[in-house]
Design a protein with these regions (language model features):
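ABC ATPase C-loop
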Residues: 159-160
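Q-loop/switch helix immediately C-terminal to the Walker
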Residues: 86, 92-108
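Walker B catalytic motif
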Residues: 171-172
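Helical segment within the ABC ATPase nucleotide-binding domain
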Residues: 181-194
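ABC ATPase NBD Q-loop/coupling interface
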Residues: 59-75, 143
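The feature captures the beta-strand-to-loop junction immediately N-terminal to the Walker
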Residues: 33-35
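Conserved hydrophobic segment flanking the Walker A/P-loop of ABC-type ATPase nucleotide-binding domains
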Residues: 24-26
Length: 218
């Protein structure tokens, strides 16, 4: 699914990634651990196409396609998803409209018809149950006034809605209490299939005990 070969990347004049190699197969969950400044979040940013980072060497192949040649939105449409450590608030944009636009843009990219209003609401309610997302939260602006746990739960809800083939969870467990972490972990586990893979970036063992990745990279 994902093949990273000798990847080098920098921000400004500072090189952060120095020859990263990583192979992820269908159905695998990988845990990436390491101290602050080791490049964990930089790797996720480079994979999704954050323009602040410059790739200076190496290759990244995703499902047989050159990921580095793709625009960030095309990487998402191809099946890449990033759950942020600090999800941003988007005042004035309802969760329903935000997700409907995102889902239908991906369907359009795939050559599929847009979901009608009734079809979308049905899908949304099905996915809400997976992550135990309150219907009231789904009706509000994106992450506005959400607690830390609600924001992280909302990220997993977005993951459920978009059905990515490779999900990157960048310190999703940061700041969560045990109950919120359990709900997030259960959502991730329910979304696992033999065709989908996941990268879990973390400092802690707690989330890993709940998700149980097969491969550890330090």
């Amino acid at each position: 699914m994902l093949e990273v070969r000798n990847l080098h990347a920098k921000i400004g004049d500072k090189e952060i990634l120095r020859g990263i190699n990583l192979t992820i197969k269908d159905g695998e969950t990988h845990a990436i651990m390491g101290p602050n400044g080791s490049g964990k979040s930089t790797l996720s940013a480079v994979l999704v196409g954050n323009p602040l980072y410059e790739v200076t060497a190496g290759e990244v192949w995703f499902n047989g396609k050159n990921l580095l040649d793709m625009k960030p939105e095309d990487r998402a449409h191809e099946g890449l998803f990033l759950s942020f450590q600090y999800p941003v608030e988007i005042p004035g944009v309802s969760m329903t409209n935000f997700m409907k636009a995102a889902v239908n843009e991906k369907r359009k990219y795939q050559g599929l018809p847009e979901l009608k209003a009734g079809e979308f609401i049905k899908l949304m309610r099905e996915k809400q149950k997976i992550v135990e997302l309150d219907n009231k939260l789904a009706g509000r602006s994106v992450n506005e006034g959400f607690s830390g746990g609600e924001k992280k739960r909302n990220e997993i809800f977005q993951m459920a809605m978009l059905e990515p083939t490779l999900s990157i969870l960048d310190e999703t467990d940061s700041g969560l209490d045990v109950d919120a972490m359990r709900i997030v972990a259960e959502g991730v586990n329910k979304l696992k299939t033999p065709e989908t893979s996941c990268i879990v970036i973390t400092h802690y063992d707690r989330l890993l005990e709940m998700i149980r990745p097969a491969v550890f990279t330090i």
